[in-house]
């Protein structure tokens, strides 16, 4: 049974200056494991990655029904399968979590579906 669905979109133009300055926002959004993946990418891919992960965590908080104030960005970890598919490795949700992230030239969009146990 579906517990919640969340979707979020992030403009890449808002993330680009953050990546270029290597600001503290990056450490607030990404877990240490996500940061390891992030650091291996080109600047263009870092912008897409950070925007996608932020959108994913926002979408999770919407699906969870609390918003980001009740669940922290560090509480949700989105890693990558060998195939390139994202998956939620850690979260406060005990059931299954389905994630989809897509990018255009200007946006990153993520959708989360939470399934109850």
Curated annotation (Swiss-Prot):
Q: Name one GO biological process term.
A: fatty acid biosynthetic process
Main location class: cytoplasm
**Cell location:** Cytoplasm
> Which segments cross the bilayer?
none
Q: Mind listing the GO molecular function terms for this protein?
A: holo-[acyl-carrier-protein] synthase activity; magnesium ion binding
Catalysis performed (reactions): apo-[ACP] + CoA = holo-[ACP] + adenosine 3',5'-bisphosphate + H(+)
What GO CC annotations are associated with the protein?
Answer: cytoplasm
Which Pfam families is this protein grouped with?
ACPS (PF01648)
List positions binding Mg(2+). Answer: 8, 58
Q: Which SUPFAM superfamilies has this protein been placed in?
A: 4'-phosphopantetheinyl transferase
| EC number, as in UniProt | 2.7.8.7
List the keywords (alphabetical).
Answer: Cytoplasm, Fatty acid biosynthesis, Fatty acid metabolism, Lipid biosynthesis, Lipid metabolism, Magnesium, Metal-binding, Transferase
What function does this protein fulfil? Transfers the 4'-phosphopantetheine moiety from coenzyme A to a Ser of acyl-carrier-protein.
Question: Which species expresses this protein natively?
Answer: Enterococcus faecalis (strain ATCC 700802 / V583)
Which named protein is this? Answer: Holo-[acyl-carrier-protein] synthase
